[in-house]
Amino acid sequence: MSESEQWGLDQFESPDGGRPDEEAAVVAGDAGQTVSEVVDAADLKFPDSEGVVEMTVSQVDYTIEGSGAEEYPVVHVFGRTAENEPEHVRVLGVEPYFYVPTENVEDRALTEEYDAILDTRTEDPSGERFESIRGEPLTKVIGQTPRDVGQMRDDFDEHYEADILFPNRFLIDKDVSAGLQVPERRLEDGRIQVRYDDEELVAVDAPTEADLRVNTFDIEVDDRSGFPEDGEEPIVCLTSHDSYDDEY
């Protein structure tokens, strides 16, 4: 997944049902609030909840905010409600992690060896120890950012789940397959910002009334010299279709 500054969709609607320039500005990242100076999710601004929002999930991405020792990941969830309103949810406090065999690291202080390792754990919050499918005790290694997980994993002879993309990690751990319920903690710009461990952040069935907007692209490439390889032949045709406008 990209680490581009994608800030998502606010609720804009023009009189003719199209999408105005304001929405494009939000998608491009030219509008909205970012949190840039605090790492701990518990210290960030979470507005009071006004209820819950259920939405069909259309895309999940992430960005890195802050800098240096204060970098932290933010998961961005995009989707639509049953009323077909677009939503952008910022989830803070999602931990990037992987597992290593406990016997390989039990004599090491990993948080002292690596600045990018924030914590190590051998048990989940309920006290159940982490194990491989063969019953081998595992240690959970929590990194500062997803990038750190990718850089550190090869330092260990054995590791598990280090290749799972960070947005997919969020979906797997929250058991999200189609829909998501979130507490309605809205920032001033209309986006929702929640903690990962919020009890109201849970998977739900997708709202069946939601009509996701799909923009389909298709290209045709000069193939007179055989099957074209990436970047070798010119594009001769580019087609785009918008499912809302039903126009090409």
Please state what every model-predicted region is.
Residues 1-248:
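The two-metal-ion catalytic cores of nucleic-acid processing enzymes
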